[in-house]
């Protein structure tokens, strides 16, 4: 068993990026479990480009139901069913999202049964693992031995449940992964209790993501050295030297943590 976690940025782009794949990370825990965080419509292509076939995944965790975070799930479901002989991987879903993920997003393309079979459900394609959530703070779920995730509610868009993720490996708070959130001082305080922080950013203030200026103004220079920026626009290179001690997470790069 390895004693390190590896995180590969499959995609680092914003929802409207044409230069980068949808923001997504492939995390390999020290026990060997490979967890994909979010699976937007361009993520299966991004995995292929990096040499990770879909059958190399053990599970997928969904943080919210925007298309750039779930749009590739239909492809994964159908590929596992028809190409991989019905293989089912874990689908880790916050308990507040399980129903809407199927009824409002995936059912339209996956509801059609085989001849003579009943109409399928989400559990016919994935091993659905409902994750605990809390409206007011952190919720902890043990996934396997020496492996756990924590969910933190975020404010992203009105009336949509969304979550940041804390990754715990061998009892160590390794990575805080913001997914999508507006600037939130309290959330950043939680984030900085982890060894490493991967935080979404945009290059203007206002809107539905934390801005680079807001992050720079709040996070100390010492802590900035532990922060990687992700979910950015195609003009990222214009800001490459304007991020203080923070670094931009690079698409295709594997980080040993």
From Swiss-Prot:
Residues 21-231 are annotated as: Beta-lactamase-like. Coordinates 2 Zn(2+) ions. One protomer coordinates the metal ions and the opposing protomer provides the catalytic residues required for cCMP hydrolysis. Keywords: Host-virus interaction, Hydrolase, Inhibition of host innate immune response by virus, Metal-binding, Viral immunoevasion, Zinc. SUPFAM superfamilies: Metallo-hydrolase/oxidoreductase. InterPro entries: Anti-Pycsar_Apyc1, Metallo-B-lactamas, RibonucZ/Hydroxyglut_hydro. Signal peptide: none annotated. One of its GO terms (biological process) is symbiont-mediated suppression of host innate immune response. Zn(2+) 1 binds at residues 68-69, 180, 231. Belongs to the anti-Pycsar protein Apyc1 family. PANTHER family: ZINC PHOSPHODIESTERASE ELAC PROTEIN 1. This is Anti-Pycsar protein Apyc1. The lineage of its organism: Viruses, Duplodnaviria, Heunggongvirae, Uroviricota, Caudoviricetes.
């Amino acid at each position: 068993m390895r004693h390190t976690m590896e995180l590969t940025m499959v995609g680092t782009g914003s929802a409207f990026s044409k230069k980068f794949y949808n923001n997504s990370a492939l995390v390999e825990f020290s026990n060997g479990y490979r967890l994909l965080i979010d699976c937007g419509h361009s993520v299966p292509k991004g995995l292929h480009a990096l040499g990770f076939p879909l059958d190399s995944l053990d599970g997928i965790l969904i943080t919210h139901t925007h298309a750039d975070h779930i749009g590739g799930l239909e492809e994964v479901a159908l590929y596992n069913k028809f190409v991989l002989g019905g293989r089912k991987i874990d689908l880790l879903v916050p308990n507040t999202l399980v129903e809407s993920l199927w009824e409002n997003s995936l059912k339209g393309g996956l509801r059609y049964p085989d001849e003579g079979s009943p109409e399928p459900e989400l559990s016919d394609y994935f091993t659905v693992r409902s994750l605990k959530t809390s409206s007011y703070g952190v919720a902890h779920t043990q996934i396997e031995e020496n492996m756990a995730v924590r969910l933190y509610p975020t404010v992203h868009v009105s009336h949509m449940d969304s979550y940041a993720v804390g990754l715990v490996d061998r009892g160590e708070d390794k990575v805080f992964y913001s997914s999508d959130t507006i600037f939130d001082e309290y959330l950043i305080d939680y984030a900085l209790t982890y060894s490493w922080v991967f935080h979404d950013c945009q290059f203007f203030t206002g809107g539905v993501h934390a801005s680079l200026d807001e992050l720079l103004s709040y996070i100390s220079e010492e802590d900035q050295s532990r922060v990687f920026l992700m979910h950015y626009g195609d003009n990222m290179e214009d800001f490459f030297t304007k991020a203080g001690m923070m670094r931009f997470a690079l698409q295709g790069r594997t980080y040993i943590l």
